[in-house]
Amino acid sequence: MKYLIGIDDHDSYKFGCTTHFSVILTSYLYKNHNTILLDLPYLVRLNPNIPWKTRGNASIKLIVDFNGTKKELADIIFSYSVKYVKNVSLALEHGRRPGIAIIEYDKYKSLFEKLYDFYIKGILDIIPIDYAKKFAEKNDIEIRGDRGIIGSIAALGMSGDYTYELITYRKKENWLKKRMINEDSVKRVDEETFPLTFANYDYINDSPLITPHGNDPILYGIRGTSIEHLIKAMELIESNEDINFFAVFKTNQNTDIHFQKVGNRFYQEIKKVIQIKNIKILEGGDVMIRTTDDDILFVYKETGELNSAAKLLKEGDEIVAYGAIKPSITYGKIIELERFEILKLNDLQLINPKCPICGGPTKSLGKNKGYKCKKCKYIINTANKSMKNIIRNLSLGIYQTRAYRHLTRPIFLTLENNNQSFHEERKFLDMYRSELYKLDYHL
């Protein structure tokens, strides 16, 4: 029978990774329970703003054929899950609460809208564990575990635009060693495969973007829209250690799914047309923007080009603000921007009148007190300020941080999951199944 499996919360801040678990689980099910993977695994990013998430807040969806009941499959998977979090990720020691969710494929089709709504809620909002358990009970979803149930159910509902990520995994003896990736080979990947792969190298800070920084099992991950070019990229990248195994995931990364539905509560995303009241460049380079609606927006120095553009905004400019709503001890509520689109630029500036005697510049003596010439000191009592057109070093359009988050869609990216993508996936899946059978991993 055909089933959908959701998996979450198998990593920790020290070791392990939910994607890593999903690959060795798929191999284990294939070799020991004749369970066939029917589609590429799905890497599902959820709410990026939740404070207690690990790294990328990702869950996994698998579609498999299993000769048994939903309960039997859940028992097999959760037993393997417990071994992984005890022996590999040490997740329980670090406050993780793994979970799984399973539903029959036929039932999934009839519950599609409900599951999709749960998925979107998992991206936009914070879902209580009790809500997830009641949802599972009401819709006959088999669950095991604890908090990871939330992300597992959300993963079941993933649908819509997707990209791919190819992830390579390290041998266990290398997990505590520094990753040594030849940077020139990563640049070569960019030269030969961009834009079908992307986010490979940061040319501003001169460092690769494909490597994580923790002790997790991942060597590197490459994002793209073509499996063929992801494989080519992997073949081009040079490292001082051998790859243990790799997988290609379908993923909602880089699709802007987090802006499909927005809100106005803490840890939700916001997309809002605002008019700028004033900006302030803070010590250190962060930009604080106040709006005519009394919203407070922050554009942090680390956002690079976005921060530079924000410094050039002024009163009267109109933008669409994209960002996350966060609590602030100082301001109560702030919006952290990851992108803005300039709709209207205020290209007018109020200027003091010229001196009628010598033509020199003047300075204000205070409200309704007139102006004083800076050169000849003549006092003007009746003149008013005038408007002057100014040149702005900005243009209408979208400005975005170069260090975009997992879900953020790059400006250049076109998403076209077409028949060519389908044929690529089928071809790769056949090869991937045989690799899964060869994989020898013992917990």
UniProtKB/Swiss-Prot annotation:
Principal EC category: ligase
Keywords: ATP-binding, Cytoplasm, Ligase, Nucleotide-binding, tRNA processing
A Pfam family assignment: TiaS_FLD
Catalysis: reaction(s): cytidine(34) in tRNA(Ile2) + agmatine + ATP + H2O = 2-agmatinylcytidine(34) in tRNA(Ile2) + AMP + 2 phosphate + 2 H(+)
Enzyme Commission number: 6.3.4.22
Major subcellular site: cytoplasm
ATP-binding listed as a keyword: yes
Domain of life assignment: Archaea
Keyword Nucleotide-binding attributed: yes
GO biological process: tRNA wobble cytosine modification
Gene3D superfamilies in the record: 2.40.50.1010, 3.30.70.2200, 3.90.600.20
GO CC annotations on file: cytoplasm
Gene Ontology MF term list: ATP binding; ligase activity, forming carbon-nitrogen bonds
Location(s) in or outside the cell: Cytoplasm
Xref: PANTHER family: TRNA(ILE2) 2-AGMATINYLCYTIDINE SYNTHETASE TIAS
Entry function: ATP-dependent agmatine transferase that catalyzes the formation of 2-agmatinylcytidine (agm2C) at the wobble position (C34) of tRNA(Ile2), converting the codon specificity from AUG to AUA.
Similarity section: Belongs to the TiaS family.
Name of this protein: tRNA(Ile2) 2-agmatinylcytidine synthetase TiaS
Species of provenance: Saccharolobus islandicus (strain L.S.2.15 / Lassen #1)
